[in-house]
From Swiss-Prot:
Family, similarity comment: Belongs to the adhesin P1 family.
Biased composition (Basic and acidic residues): 156-170, 191-206
InterPro entries reported for this sequence: P1_N
Organism domain of life: Bacteria
Protein name, entry field: Uncharacterized protein MPN_205
Transmembrane segments: none
Region (Disordered): 1-22, 156-264
Skewed-composition ranges (Low complexity): 171-189
Organism this protein belongs to: Mycoplasma pneumoniae (strain ATCC 29342 / M129 / Subtype 1) (Mycoplasmoides pneumoniae)
One Pfam family linked to the record: P1_N
Length: 438
């Protein structure tokens, strides 16, 4: 979790912790509660603010549009929750900033829970335990809500001649065929078994050492898609994985306790169509310790990536070179696949990435899934305004290359939102253009 300027509120502690942003280690995000922990001025922990269990109400205002508050009774509450609170409350806080002019007002950056799980999966961290390994009394931390397992490769000489081809396997090795079909929940020896087919090829620069490179079904570099079953080729889809266990069995499959489906790669258009569920959100929170009505939720704003990309300067719609002076083709492919622009569109005449070297077809640049959530942040209170910076979607392999920030959401006390576009750099004040939102 990222904590910029909040002095009285930070993340809770737990047995399992992981830092969401490695550059900021002063606060951590627990994988069990996803809660903010409130501290007093002496540094003593008071209580946790768990949004999934919180029943908030919006504060009341006086004739001057000021929040009504007294030290004993707390905030005046209207009795109604903020709009779309049921969707927002399931998101995870990843950054918090305290208003220097109001010790009770905080701005919280919320992201979908699946984004944090995806971040942990990319970093190779342990996922939340949802099961235990069979035959062992110890809990296996590598078996999480995704159903992932880690096991060292072992040679099995007894099954060196085994073939997953049903009748062919039965004729060549009857005992092996019987055991194979039994492991898959069937005792019928005539049942044919379909195996996962992965085609491989040698790298051109690694023929001597025998290293292999995936040619198809490369799930690490391409989004998971469901394809037609042809022969024995099997392709997975994103719904085969999940983010949280489902005790009612309403998840990705019909088995009890199966994980709910999630999509690790989201296009800009998908986030735009369902902002309460998939976008990053800004929550304005009022919290006053020792008061009867101590917590109130002022408002919720969603950060729309489609609006961000629509305001890109023309120069940013062209392909970019990385800091090595080389064009990152892998980054371009990831950009296409994660934004949904990998499909041909003959009517597309906008500036963007050239899809084919011998063609004039191009796709408009869009904010990738990872860049959208990774770059939005750096909450900063500036007087009565809150600045939220966002990235321009530049994809690079280097972890030290900071993308230019082009977007600021400014929150004012009178509930007026201004959006500013930085054309070149955050430090160049002469290139700021203002746009007032409706």
């Amino acid at each position: 979790m990222r904590d910029n300027t909040a002095k009285g509120i930070t993340a809770g502690s737990g047995s399992q912790q992981t830092t969401y942003d490695p550059a900021r280690t002063e606060a951590t995000l627990t994988t069990t509660t996803f809660a903010l922990r409130r501290y007093d001025l002496a540094g003593r922990a008071l209580y946790d603010l768990d949004f999934s269990k919180l029943n908030p109400q919006t504060p009341t205002r006086d004739a001057n549009c000021q929040i009504t508050f007294n030290p004993f009774g707390g905030f005046g509450l209207s009795g109604s929750a903020p709009q779309q609170w049921n969707e927002v409350k399931n998101k995870v806080p990843v950054e918090v900033a305290q208003d220097p002019t109001d010790p009770y007002r905080f701005a919280v950056l919320l992201v979908p829970r699946s984004v944090v799980y995806y971040e942990q999966l990319q970093r190779g961290l342990a996922l939340p335990n949802q099961g235990s390994s069979s035959g062992s009394g110890q809990q296996n931390t590598t078996i999480g809500a995704y159903g992932l397992k880690v096991k060292n490769a072992e040679a099995d000489t007894a099954k060196s001649n085994e073939k997953l081809q049903g009748d062919e396997s039965k004729s060549s090795n009857g005992s092996s065929s019987t055991s194979t079909t039994t492991q898959r929940g069937s005792t019928n020896s005539d049942t044919k078994v379909k195996a996962l087919k992965i085609e491989v090829k040698k790298k051109s620069d690694s023929e001597d050492n025998g290293q292999l490179q995936l040619e198809k079904n490369d799930l690490a570099n391409a989004p998971i898609k469901r394809g037609e079953e042809s022969g024995q080729s099997v392709q997975l889809k994103a719904d085969d994985f999940g983010t949280a266990p489902s005790s009612s069995g309403s998840g990705g499959n019909s088995n009890p306790g199966s994980p709910t489906p999630w999509r690790p790669w989201l296009a800009t258009e998908q986030i735009h169509k369902d902002l309460p569920k998939w976008s990053a959100s800004i929550l304005i929170l009022y919290d006053a310790p020792y008061a009867r009505n101590r917590t109130a939720i002022d408002r919720v704003d969603h950060l729309d990536p489609k609006v961000m990309t629509a305001n890109y300067p023309p120069s940013w719609r062209m392909p970019k070179w990385n800091h090595h002076g080389l064009w990152d083709w892998k980054a371009r492919d990831v950009l296409f696949q994660t934004t949904g622009f990998d499909e041909s569109n003959t009517s597309n005449t906008k500036q963007g990435f050239q899809k084919e070297a011998d063609s004039d077809k191009s796709a408009p640049i869009a904010l990738p899934f990872e860049a959208y959530f990774a770059n939005i942040g750096n909450l900063t209170w500036f007087g009565q305004a809150l600045l939220v910076f966002g990235g321009n979607g530049h994809v690079t392999k280097s972890a030290h290359t900071a993308p230019l920030s082009i977007w600021l959401y400014i929150y004012l006390v009178k509930a007026v939102t201004f959006r500013l576009l930085l054309a070149n750099s955050l430090l160049s004040k002469s290139n700021i253009y203002k746009k007032t939102a409706n």
